[in-house]
């Protein structure tokens, strides 16, 4: 999957972001870029229209769709084109994500493109470098991606998607060519979305089995997300600002009593230390977490981004299998089951939270509506299917 993804990203470097628009509107910098990779090429509306049709036509094979772009863009002659892809890997250069990306360098070079892949252990720094233009694209969590692209960032909304199968259907809809325009937001375009599993509540005391019982406890919240602190305060708990790396350490060291995290973090981040001896994991998913590849729209045209998004989607089952292998490492004794009535209460509270965050401009209303449609597709008896508020 990674080879195909990197290859598609490479091809996208050969095309100006706006050169494919039907009105063929380009900035001076984009014209200069195009002249470098395809000297003498004149783009007509007819050529752009044909390319766009081929790029979004899922009845064609990926090589056929890519070939249309290659013929139009041409290849650079002599000078290498350079782009920077920044990769957030908690283990940095020794991490599996960064290592896999580095392995593709020889594949990329044959396209006449030099890609500088930079590992980041700090998601905050990566995000700032993407904003400043030091990164042409960045791999980050969906929670962070919301700062760049509210529509895709809302996929990680609290209670928005209850399980893996619903997540699959949602991503199929999100990544469909008919939805391509929604994947561009100003200066940024979504190049890919991958599932990272459901987030659960980890506690250091099994008595904290409900939101009401979290009152007076310390809860880790992301320092860049003020709404998390607001929600925690509303249930009478104390928010403790953290980043995505320090939060697990605070939980393991007893600085915070409650931590929301995906199950894959259990072994990797040694969260069993924070739960020992009397803690556990509340068996109720808070949200479906994603990893998202966010690119600068002046560097990556949406036509190529569509192919990359589809490459991500095609590997949904493989990713979920690997996530399952990791989550299977969580011993059964850690699970805390909660009564059905409490689960229903949680669903109501999460819906209220989504509505509140939507009205504040934090969540995208179109994505929330799509998530509701997915939930109702699986269970039409839900009250929200009769009287929708999202």
Regions found by a protein language model. Give the residues of each.
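Bacterial N-terminal signal peptides
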Residues: 6-16
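Contiguous mixed-secondary-structure segments that line small-molecule binding/active-site clefts
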Residues: 27-78, 107, 128-131, 141-234, ...
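Short, well-ordered beta-strand elements
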Residues: 71-97, 115-119, 216-220
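Alpha-to-beta junction loops
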Residues: 113, 130-140, 237-238, 253-262
């Amino acid at each position: 999957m990674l080879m195909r993804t990197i290859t598609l990203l490479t091809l996208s470097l050969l095309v100006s972001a706006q050169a494919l628009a039907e009105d063929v509107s380009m900035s001076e910098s984009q014209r200069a870029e195009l002249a470098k990779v395809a000297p003498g090429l004149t783009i007509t509306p007819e050529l752009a229209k044909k390319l766009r049709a081929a790029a979004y036509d899922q009845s064609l094979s990926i090589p056929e769709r890519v070939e249309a772009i290659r013929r139009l863009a041409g290849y650079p002659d002599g000078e290498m084109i350079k782009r920077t892809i920044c990769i957030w890997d908690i283990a940095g250069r020794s991490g599996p994500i960064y290592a896999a990306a580095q392995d593709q360098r020889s594949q990329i070079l044959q396209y006449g493109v030099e890609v500088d892949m930079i590992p980041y252990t700090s998601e905050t720094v990566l995000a700032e470098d993407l904003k400043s233009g030091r990164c042409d694209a960045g791999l980050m969590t969906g929670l962070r991606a919301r700062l760049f692209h509210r529509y895709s960032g809302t996929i990680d909304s609290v209670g928005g998607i209850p399980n893996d199968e619903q997540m699959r259907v949602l991503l199929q809809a999100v990544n469909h060519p008919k939805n391509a325009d929604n994947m561009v937001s100003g200066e940024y375009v979504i190049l890919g979305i991958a599932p990272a599993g459901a987030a659960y509540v980890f506690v250091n005391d099994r008595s904290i089995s409900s939101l009401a019982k979290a009152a007076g406890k310390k809860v880790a919240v992301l320092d860049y997300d003020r709404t998390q602190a607001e929600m925690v305060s509303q249930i009478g708990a104390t928010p403790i600002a953290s980043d995505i790396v320090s939060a697990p350490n605070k939980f393991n060291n007893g600085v915070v009593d409650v931590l929301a995290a995906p199950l894959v973090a259990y072994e990797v981040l040694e969260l069993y230390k924070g739960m020992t001896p009397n803690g556990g994991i509340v068996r109720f998913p808070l949200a479906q977490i994603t990893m998202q590849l966010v690119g600068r729209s002046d560097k990556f045209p949406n036509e190529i981004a569509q192919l990359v998004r589809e490459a991500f989607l095609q590997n949904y089952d493989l990713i979920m299998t690997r996530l399952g292998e990791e989550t299977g490492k969580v011993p059964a004794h850690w699970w805390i089951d909660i009564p059905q009535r409490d689960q229903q209460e949680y669903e109501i509270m999460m819906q209220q939270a989504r509505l509140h965050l939507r009205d504040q401009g934090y969540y995208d209303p179109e994505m929330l509506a799509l998530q509701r449609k997915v939930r109702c597709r699986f269970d039409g008896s839900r009250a929200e299917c009769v009287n929708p508020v999202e």
